[in-house]
């Protein structure tokens, strides 16, 4: 093992009430990260969020259990290309819209780079939604329990523990010490693979709902007695998170404590960590987890002492998180495909050639049409308009193609992302970038994971002078194309 088991076994569960008063933290030097570049909390319309998530498309669901979950989280993109995560609550979760808004506003005042911050909310009719920063690199649960390419390294696990402790200290200092159901699914990884704490846990899943949705084996003992979550309950949950990091498994605290008391440490530590840490470091992390899991809430540490304890344990401080995780950095330059290169250069002629060669191959499974019984002369006329549009598109008669494609779309008998993409390019050829952007966004509504829709948005945004947004859209297109090619 990476730590000497004989020395670790000499450790038994020790309470350290004095430790909760340790003072030095790493947060003071981190004030630069209080989210000053983020927009202020705002209220969104349901229409805006519906458009951002392509009509709450199932392809955009990023939460555990998919559509079966009582509260579903979607990824989305606003008109300004900012990527967002949208949590849509069960319709009966928050009947009092005023109470929901007050809670959301309070959480929305928090801004810290250790968190996936809350950007806004929506409370139209029975709809209750939260809007947060989108974190593209999955959850801690994914990287710990369901890893594919490599297990998480010891140095990265320590970094996760520190960052989450710092996030909890920040929230506590801002008067939001209660965090509901802290677990590995609440820890997210940003563009640079740095771990962040989801803001969603700062609000209950409903006005009167439970604070813990996980198995009762992981629930703080006082919550089982009283049904109330306290700041000390959050520390208990942090202890279960440390167990996850130590073991690489979601191990019940009672079982972990039994292993520690029996000095059977080898059964607790993830075998993937062999050779990565010292006996002293392993002992210290187990000691810290045991303190967090004390039965008596008053014997648990507070967030400040967690930060103090975690700072000396940090390893490979100069190594970026994305390197430790084996994930490409957001700043790294991924080679663009020929289409991506053409969009980067705004080479409309090259884009036209690629779309012409592609034809309607990407419409498979995305385009919809009426049933056989609904075939009518009207539909045949509509299809004829599409064919005429295709001929005009092939011969670079772009104004004519716009007219034909528009009549096809207005016919309403079939929905085709490729038609919208082709008309978008025609608008660009005719120096109508706003119309081109609208069509590219509509193509993405129909086919949320289609890279060409993002690429065309990038070209249109560049033509509109929105270079930052264009860069973000180009990056999204490249990521979607890479993901598609891996399938």
From Swiss-Prot:
Principal location: membrane
Primary role: Probable serine/threonine kinase that acts as a positive regulator of brassinosteroid (BR) signaling downstream of the receptor kinase BRI1. Functions redundantly with BSK3, BSK5, BSK6 and BSK8.
GO molecular function, one term: protein serine kinase activity
Catalytic activity, reaction form: L-seryl-[protein] + ATP = O-phospho-L-seryl-[protein] + ADP + H(+); L-threonyl-[protein] + ATP = O-phospho-L-threonyl-[protein] + ADP + H(+)
Source organism (scientific name): Arabidopsis thaliana (Mouse-ear cress)
N-myristoyl glycine-type lipidated residues: 2
Catalytic residues as annotated in Swiss-Prot or TrEMBL: 181 (proton acceptor)
SUPFAM superfamilies per record: Protein kinase-like (PK-like), TPR-like
GO BP: brassinosteroid mediated signaling pathway
UniProt xrefs under InterPro entries: BSK (IPR045845), Kinase-like_dom_sf (IPR011009), Prot_kinase_dom (IPR000719), Ser-Thr/Tyr_kinase_cat_dom (IPR001245), TPR-like_helical_dom_sf (IPR011990)
Database matches in PROSITE patterns: PROTEIN_KINASE_DOM
Pfam families per UniProt: PK_Tyr_Ser-Thr (PF07714)
A GO CC annotation given for this chain: plasmodesma
Family according to the record: Belongs to the protein kinase superfamily. Ser/Thr protein kinase family.
Record key words, sorted: ATP-binding, Brassinosteroid signaling pathway, Cell membrane, Kinase, Lipoprotein, Membrane, Myristate, Nucleotide-binding, Serine/threonine-protein kinase, Transferase
Residues that bind ATP: 65-73, 87
PANTHER family attached to this UniProt entry: SERINE/THREONINE-PROTEIN KINASE BSK5, SERINE_THREONINE-PROTEIN KINASE BSK7-RELATED
EC number: 2.7.11.1
Annotated Protein kinase domain residues: 59-325
Gene: BSK7
Name of the protein this chain belongs to: Serine/threonine-protein kinase BSK7
Record's subcellular location: Cell membrane
Membrane topology annotation: Lipid-anchor
């Amino acid at each position: 093992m990476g730590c000497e088991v004989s020395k670790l076994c000499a450790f038994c569960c020790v309470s350290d009430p004095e430790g909760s008063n340790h003072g030095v933290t790493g947060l003071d030097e981190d004030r630069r990260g209080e989210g000053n570049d983020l927009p202020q909390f705002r209220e969104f319309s349901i229409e805006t969020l519906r458009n951002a998530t392509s009509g709450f498309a199932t392809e955009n669901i990023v939460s555990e259990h998919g559509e079966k979950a009582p509260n579903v989280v979607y990824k989305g993109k606003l008109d300004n290309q900012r990527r967002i995560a949208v949590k849509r609550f069960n319709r009966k979760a928050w009947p009092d819209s005023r109470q929901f808004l007050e809670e959301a506003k309070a959480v929305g005042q928090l801004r810290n780079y250790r968190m996936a911050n809350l950007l806004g909310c929506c409370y139209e009719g029975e709809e209750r939604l939260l809007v947060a920063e989108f974190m593209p690199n999955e959850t801690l649960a994914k990287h710990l329990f369901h890893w594919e390419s490599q297990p998480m390294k010891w140095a990265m696990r320590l970094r996760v523990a520190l960052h989450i402790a710092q996030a909890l200290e920040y929230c506590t200092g801002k008067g939001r010490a209660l965090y509901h159901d802290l677990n590995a699914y609440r820890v997210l990884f940003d563009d640079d693979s740095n771990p962040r704490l989801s803001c969603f846990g700062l609000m209950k899943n409903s006005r009167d709902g439970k604070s813990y949705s996980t198995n009762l084996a992981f629930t703080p003992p006082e919550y089982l007695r009283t049904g109330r979550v306290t700041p000390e309950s959050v520390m208990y949950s942090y202890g279960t998170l440390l167990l996850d990091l130590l073991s690489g498994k979601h191990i019940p605290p009672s079982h972990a404590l039994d292993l520690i008391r029996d000095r059977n440490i080898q059964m607790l530590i993830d075998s993937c960590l062999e050779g990565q840490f010292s006996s002293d470091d392993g002992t210290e992390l187990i000691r810290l987890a045991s303190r967090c899991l004390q039965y008596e809430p008053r014997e648990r540490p507070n967030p400040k002492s967690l930060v103090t304890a975690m700072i000396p344990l940090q390893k490979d401080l100069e190594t970026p998180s994305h390197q430790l995780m084996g994930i490409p950095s957001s700043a790294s330059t991924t080679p663009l495909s020929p289409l991506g290169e053409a969009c980067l250069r705004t080479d409309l002629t090259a884009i036209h050639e690629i779309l012409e060669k592609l034809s309607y191959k990407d419409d498979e499974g995305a385009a919809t049409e009426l049933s056989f019984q609904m075939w009518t002369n009207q539909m045949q006329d509509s299809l004829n308009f599409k064919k005429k549009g295709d001929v005009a598109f092939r011969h670079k008669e772009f104004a004519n193609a716009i007219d034909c494609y528009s009549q096809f779309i207005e016919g309403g008998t079939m929905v085709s992302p490729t038609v919208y993409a082709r008309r978008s390019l025609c608008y660009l050829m005719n120096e109508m970038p706003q119309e081109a952007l609208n069509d590219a966004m509509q193509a993405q509504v129909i086919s949320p994971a289609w890279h060409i829709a993002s690429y065309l948005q990038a070209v249109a945004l560049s033509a509109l002078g929105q270079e930052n947004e264009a860069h973000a859209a180009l990056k999204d297109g490249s990521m979607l194309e890479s993901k598609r090619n891996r399938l």
